[in-house]
């Protein structure tokens, strides 16, 4: 079956799950993460078929995969993201995308859909990236005096390391070069990470643009939530579904299987039990009562 039609068949089901998740979640503005993933062993060299690369939307507050679009390679994410955003109701949400998706047309599409964005900046954004970095570095020299900046700091310990993150959000200066590139641009920001691993210290700075107004905790939450698609969704697909090991090489079948993997993960994530996703999959095989409750998002 055509992958787009196949996903459309799940629309009502997914809407029902999303409504239930919204009732359980107290987030006023849910964060939707957009990111790509390569299905590493889905290539077929004999027939000159490259590995499948997919782009999906993960609602981190709801633990739901809301849609997926396949591309031939990672470089095609720029064209896949607009198509994906058209498939999903993103109204009132905060959309987070890495630097590849920081494009004028994508920012406009998000704002036109009555959503907000937090988009990563890297060197490929040229003038805008350089202007944001320069403005923030100059502001750091004066400890952000007179910039209207707001800060929020978090500390985490685990996996043999200590990490302190400082989130800084600033209003967009009127003279910022390249500011007209992105519709609705209101704030810029940086996350400065200081990491201590066994006495070895390192630091990192990541820059962002956003249509959000000032509110540094909301800004920080959106950035932190973006990692959920990698740490929760993609990790489970690789470790539990073994997606990277799949040798399905038929175009339509591998796309539809990719969506089924994401949808079944979403179903299991709705169960409030403390067991791992792998154990919940086993419960579906062992316990018919559990199995019949999972599809409606009411597993107990």
What is the predicted role of each segment?
Residues 1-97, 102-105, 274, 286:
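Conserved, well-structured functional cores that handle cations and Mg-NTP chemistry
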Residues 3, 86, 115, 137, ...:
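Generic secondary-structure signature for well-ordered alpha-helical cores
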Residues 4, 8, 12, 179-188, ...:
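Charged, often Cys/His-bearing segments associated with DNA-binding zinc-finger transcription factors
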Residues 35, 117, 230:
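Residue-level signature of catalytic and energy-coupling elements of molecular machines
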Residues 107-115:
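Short, surface-exposed basic-aromatic patches at helix termini and helix-loop junctions that form
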Residues 118, 122-225:
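An anionic, glycine-rich sequence signature occurring as long contiguous blocks
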Residues 145, 236-300:
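A short, flexible helix-boundary coil/loop motif
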Residues 209, 213-248:
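Short amphipathic alpha-helical "interface-anchor" segments enriched in bulky aromatics
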């Amino acid at each position: 079956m055509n992958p787009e039609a196949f996903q459309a068949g799940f629309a009502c089901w997914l809407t029902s799950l999303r409504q239930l998740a919204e009732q359980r979640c107290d987030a006023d503005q849910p964060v939707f993460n957009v990111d790509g993933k390569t299905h590493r062993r889905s290539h077929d060299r004999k027939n000159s078929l490259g590995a499948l690369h997919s782009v999906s939307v993960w609602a981190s507050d709801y633990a739901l995969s809301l849609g997926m679009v396949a591309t031939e390679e990672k470089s095609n994410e720029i064209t896949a993201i607009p198509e994906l955003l058209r498939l999903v109701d993103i109204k009132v949400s905060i959309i987070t995308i890495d630097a590849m998706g920081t494009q004028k047309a994508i920012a406009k599409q998000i704002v036109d859909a009555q959503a907000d964005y937090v988009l990563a900046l890297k060197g490929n954004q040229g003038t805008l990236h350089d202007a944001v970095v320069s403005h923030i570095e100059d502001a750091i020299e004066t400890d952000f005096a007179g910039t209207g900046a707001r800060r929020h700091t978090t500390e985490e310990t685990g996996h043999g390391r200590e990490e302190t993150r400082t989130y800084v959000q600033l209003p967009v200066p009127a003279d910022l070069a390249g500011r007209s590139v992105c519709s609705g641009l209101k704030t810029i920001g940086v996350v400065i990470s200081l990491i201590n691993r066994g006495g070895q210290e390192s630091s990192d700075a990541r820059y962002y643009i956003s249509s959000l107004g000032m509110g540094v905790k909301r800004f920080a939450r959106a950035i932190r939530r973006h990692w959920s698609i990698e740490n929760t969704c993609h990790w489970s697909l690789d470790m539990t579904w073994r997606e990277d090991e799949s040798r399905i090489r038929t175009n339509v079948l591998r796309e539809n299987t990719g969506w089924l993997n994401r949808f079944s993960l979403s179903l299991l994530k709705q169960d409030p039990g403390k067991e791992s996703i792998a154990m919940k999959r086993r419960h579906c095989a062992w316990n018919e009562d559990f199995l019949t409750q999972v599809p409606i998002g009411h597993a107990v």
